[in-house]
Amino acid sequence: MSKDEILEIIKASRAKGTSSPFVGALDREAEIDKTLVQLESCLVQPFTVEVVAAYHPQEGCEFINKPNVVVIAEANKEYLLYSISTKLFAKAWRTGENQFTLLGFSTDDVIAEWRG
């Protein structure tokens, strides 16, 4: 998977809208666009990773121990993951050389997941 493919996936997610709150923003659309610019500046060359559960309820998550999960962005030691098979995004911490633990939920809303 290339960065160009990731950009297309991000644009498709953006086109669906976002549920992410922008409390206090006078121009919500401008804030969303600013968030996307910031995300694009943090894109990395996608690489496949292993995702492990941080706690028992995550063990059934669509990211845990599944193939085709890639890192697509990184900022402040937090990583944005994308599941090629489920087409969902999730934020994670790096817990090993090629091992990541989810911070929370996964959705198809790239903006909500990137903002955490």
Predicted regions located by residue number:
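N-terminal domain-onset segments
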Residues: 1-60
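Weak global preference for isoleucine
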Residues: 6-10, 32, 64, 72, ...
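Amphipathic protein-protein interaction modules
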Residues: 42-101
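Compact, glycine/acidic-enriched structural inserts
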Residues: 93-116
